[in-house]
Amino acid sequence: MRTLLIMAVLLLGVEGSLLQLRKMIKKMTNKEPILSYSKYGCNCGMAGRGKPVDATDTCCSIHNCCYGKVTSCSTKWDSYSYSWENGDIVCDEKHPCKDVCECDKAVATCFRDNLDTYKKRNIFHPTSSCVKVSTPC
């Protein structure tokens, strides 16, 4: 249900963190994030937390932990400011939601750097086979 809500918001064109994250991932990986990552492995999207199935899923685990440390802004709805320089994301140092931007930059870069571990079979990885991790962060 939450995935459908997120997709609906993205389709409305709201300029918030989720849309900005989508744009970063799309540009870095050339993959449509909603289709490629929203249900990937044990940690991407709304799948929850568990032992990562591969390096791509580890990117999501790290991203979840990063979001858990953000206190100043909404990780889903508040927008931030960033630019592209030589194919890299540069977060605006002075923006109040810079921490959210840095989390999103890290996961988009991680996805790009681990494209060789991405497996289509992990898109709908059954959560029942995810091994819970007592301290994921």
Swiss-Prot record:
Q: Does the keyword Ligase apply?
A: no
Q: In which tissues is it expressed?
A: Expressed by the venom gland.
Q: Tell me the Pfam families matching this sequence.
A: Phospholip_A2_1
> Which cellular component appears as one GO term in the record?
extracellular region
UniProt xrefs under Gene3D superfamilies = Phospholipase A2 domain
Question: Which InterPro entries does this entry report, sorted A to Z?
Answer: PLipase_A2, PLipase_A2_Asp_AS, PLipase_A2_dom, PLipase_A2_dom_sf, PLipase_A2_His_AS
One of the entry's Gene Ontology molecular-function terms is: calcium ion binding
Which residue windows are coiled coil? Answer: none
Annotated signal peptide: 1-16
According to its UniProt record, where is this protein mainly located? secreted
Q: Which UniProt keywords apply?
A: Blood coagulation cascade inhibiting toxin, Disulfide bond, Hemostasis impairing toxin, Myotoxin, Secreted, Signal, Toxin
Extract the CDD domains matched here. PLA2c
> Domain of life, per the record?
Eukaryota
Q: What disulfide bonds does the UniProt entry report for this chain?
A: C42-C130, C44-C60, C59-C110, C65-C137, C66-C103, C73-C97, C91-C101
- GO biological processes: arachidonate secretion; lipid catabolic process; negative regulation of T cell proliferation; phospholipid metabolic process
Location(s), subcellular: Secreted
Function noted in UniProt: Snake venom phospholipase A2 homolog that induces local edema a few hours after injection (5-10 ug) in the hind paw, and shows weak anticoagulant and myotoxic activities.
Q: Which family does it belong to?
A: Belongs to the phospholipase A2 family. Group II subfamily. N49 sub-subfamily.
Name of this chain's protein: Basic phospholipase A2 homolog CTs-R6
Q: What is the species of this protein?
A: Trimeresurus stejnegeri (Chinese green tree viper)
